[in-house]
Amino acid sequence: TGACFVPRIIRLDDHTLRCFFACEDQGGRRQSQTWYRDFDLRTRTFSPNIHRVRLRTAEGTFDLQPNHFHAAAAKHGFKQPAKAFGLYLLDSFKQIDGRTILAINNFPGAQNALATLNEARDTIEIIGHYNEPAEARLTESSVNRLPDGTWLAICRSESGNRNYRFVTSKDGRTWSPGEERPFVSKGSNSKPTFDKFDGVYYLGWQEASRIVDGHGVGRYIFNVEVSRDGVTWERKYRFEAIESFQYPTFRQHDGSIWFAVTQGKGGSTDRIMFGKLE
């Protein structure tokens, strides 16, 4: 079965958006490929052409496909089997120290990396890989840089108790093994968020607890913790929804924080909602 999956958008200039998406055969018969296509805000039309996104590793520059991502990680000791699909621009895009930063991920392969997007906005370059402990099957991370320069990523876990794991790095290249932290407990296997707005970090995570009316464990509760230093955290928001509240994205525009979130019965994604956080 084929799919166009996991869209991401970045603004190129006042008139143009660049839209990224993965095109994949989820049966694994061929390598998936990430593409981009530009959208003209003046004419409200897409360019007639689509283009392949490229991947730069220590070994060279290749099409952004899972086999090249896996080969780069294997050079650093990654031992999980290769997957032909599931490579996504997961956590994007953040401006940090003059660079456009993102986290990329192969979901079925439990593979993650910190990366940059080049100035031409057509090539992803890997900075460093974080995949340990392998038995936790880390995936779908969100990353930011703390005031002391340390990189911190919160990762979804697909094994064990499935609570979120945190990995850190001083240089973005060498990372610590993932560990749980006490301010995030009873986490569920769903994508987290980690943003910084006006000097405040916003860290969002899915909770696996049952909600008040007795519905079962699922993506019904989403918490947002805030911190100025990335060390001391406090709860700012708790969203509860019978029909799920999952995979939100938060963005700041004109002094306000906006969000888009998916919702649906039984944890599916029947609709997308848009709103103002603060």
State the predicted function of each range:
Residues 1-2, 10-190, 196-244, 252-256, ...:
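Beta-rich carbohydrate-recognition and catalytic domains
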